[in-house]
Amino acid sequence: MINKDIYQALQQLIPNEKIKVDEPLKRYTYTKTGGNADFYITPTKNEEVQAVVKYAYQNEIPVTYLGNGSNIIIREGGIRGIVISLLSLDHIEVSDDAIIAGSGAAIIDVSRVALDYALTGLEFACGIPGSIGGAVYMNAGAYGGEVKDCIDYALCVNEQGSLIKLTTKELELDYRNSIIQKEHLVVLEAAFTLAPGKMTEIQAKMDDLTERRESKQPLEYPSCGSVFQRPPGHFAGKLIQDSNLQGHRIGGVEVSTKHAGFMVNVDNGTATDYENLIHYVQKTVKEKFGIELNREVRIIGEHPKES
């Protein structure tokens, strides 16, 4: 789909320096895997996102959105059409007890701003390696807290390029799910309503959560974060551990020996390695316990062409 007409049209909508052609996506994912994007766009304004989305819709060009690539696997075949990186939409503003943050802002950074202003409610996010857009998309959470507990609204763009402002209720936030996924929307910014707190207490809670995370999670290797959703009444990591799968490797990717809920890239692993290992773990746990493990990590892009 790389053609001159699309490139020239994009140049009319967004500055040329924000457009990359045939761009390797492994540079932008935590797994360090992924093929190329036909067109990789890095808008810095909401209006630029709207313009590109509207053009793509009118011309039936597929659009894919990327945040900081922390909970996603991109196949080696790459992504056709237009990939829009939202990382440059990274503003963070504080107004009384509320924080408004752009889609590309790291939720860790937003939690630290909350700390700076002695606002409580985002401590749970101090170790989540995702962007605001991704966090709202999947209702990210950790250690008993989640986005739906403190979000006020999200400003989104629909498939036609129109702006939509959704309240907490309208976002339909559920366990690792939201209306954003169901309606193929993209988050441009989100507002969080917090509460005044004591800085020392907020800091202490964040320090505790950070220590717990660092002691339990395999942060020394590239990974896609938590691979599976929590099955009702169970923990995915415990099921995988009890299936004796820790350390099991396919290609360069293995089930972490530190935390069975993670898969790490230990030796130049590929997206195909990740996908094959995920399927193997799902099959093994299903056979042993009769429990389906549903993915939390997103897998997108085309399979590599067979040589």
Curated annotation (Swiss-Prot):
Localization in the cell: Cytoplasm
Top-level taxonomic group: Bacteria
GO MF, one annotated term: FAD binding
Keyword NADP: yes
EC identifiers of the protein: 1.3.1.98
Stored InterPro entries: FAD-bd_PCMH, FAD-bd_PCMH-like_sf, FAD-bd_PCMH_sub1, FAD-bd_PCMH_sub2, MurB, MurB_C, MurB_C_sf, Oxid_FAD_bind_N
Enzyme class at the top of the EC tree: oxidoreductase
Main localization category: cytoplasm
One example of a Gene Ontology biological process annotation: cell wall organization
Catalysed transformations (reactions): UDP-N-acetyl-alpha-D-muramate + NADP(+) = UDP-N-acetyl-3-O-(1-carboxyvinyl)-alpha-D-glucosamine + NADPH + H(+)
Keyword Membrane on entry: no
Disulfide pattern: none
Active site per UniProt: 176, 226 (proton donor), 296
Named cofactor requirement(s): FAD
General function of this protein: Cell wall formation.
Similarity field: Belongs to the MurB family.
UniProt xrefs under HAMAP family: MurB
Record protein name field: UDP-N-acetylenolpyruvoylglucosamine reductase
Organism name: Staphylococcus aureus (strain COL)
